[in-house]
């Protein structure tokens, strides 16, 4: 979008996905969630984090993993995508650079042996966990049981959309639910954080002066309900329209409806 870059004096297009971790805007929610995840790592077996699409789960995970002490923890990232119980064991071993046997009994035995002997605590992050099969979700309760030692040997971070919380509310997930002492639900940004996020995004794209007026930022918050992905879409479209129409300052009347 060279026209936009040239018109507004930007070095790159803001409101995209290619932001580096150090440039991520630290909202109150991100700071609080990151602190909770960090504190939960030492003692918790299972952590639950949910939020609607575009609420910042991926950014939170990136920040969380980026700040992990790799001398103490081994992060493993998996996606739920219809993952079955055998695949869950297999994928964890593979990500830990261990060849997984085909037999479910053998793969379970090797999993427990590997975790017991690990010098660094594995942190298993399962994104889109709402898409896992029931048998895989149910298996997690057994996968954190190490009767020989009361210490937490492994930590599962289950990340998903709000339906994940609904799924584990069913009675057959009660034993799993009881093991989850730390759970976080993400929502939209506040008005203050939405305005700060917009200004920050413009600044890291190379421009010191503001592009969006206060009324525009307020209207963007109202339309997006503070959901980051929606904020990005509205702002991106407004920048394109603003450059085409030569609007030095984007006002609320310049905002384009975005589905």
Predicted regions and their residues:
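A short, basic N-terminal segment
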Residues: 1-43, 256
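Mid-core helix/loop region of P-loop NTP-binding domains shared across ATPases and GTPases
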Residues: 5, 84-91, 99-139, 147-154, ...
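Conserved NTP-binding/hydrolysis module of P-loop NTPases
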Residues: 10-17, 73-75, 83-102
